[in-house]
């Protein structure tokens, strides 16, 4: 009788935790200062008027207002326009 031990366990079976990236406040929504607008990896969207850029490229509102997205020179920007 052959005595061959069974093979090792599967090499798969790992997964990373979800990062919950993406746009969090959409165009036309009213935001307060400090609200997170976009979570991203790198600058897919750039900060515009009244928008700050965090250490992990998170875009957040610097002042209360209305969210507005725009494209300039092929780059996407997010702005927070003050409420009149």
Curated annotation (Swiss-Prot):
Keywords: Ribonucleoprotein, Ribosomal protein. PROSITE patterns: RIBOSOMAL_L27. It comes from the Bacteria. InterPro entries: Ribosomal_bL27, Ribosomal_bL27_CS. Gene3D superfamilies: 2.40.50.100. One of its GO terms (biological process) is translation. GO terms for molecular function: structural constituent of ribosome. Residues 1-20 are annotated as: Disordered. NCBIfam families: L27. This is Large ribosomal subunit protein bL27. It comes from Dictyoglomus thermophilum (strain ATCC 35947 / DSM 3960 / H-6-12). The lineage of its organism: Bacteria, Pseudomonadati, Dictyoglomota, Dictyoglomia, Dictyoglomales.
């Amino acid at each position: 009788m052959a005595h061959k031990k069974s093979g090792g366990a599967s090499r798969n079976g790992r997964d990373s935790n979800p990062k919950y990236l993406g746009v969090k406040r959409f165009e036309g929504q009213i935001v307060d200062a400090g609200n997170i607008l976009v979570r991203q990896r790198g600058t897919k969207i750039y900060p515009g008027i009244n928008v700050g850029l965090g250490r992990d490229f998170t875009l957040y509102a610097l002042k209360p207002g209305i969210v507005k997205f725009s494209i300039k020179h092929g780059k996407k920007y997010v702005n927070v326009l003050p409420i009149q």
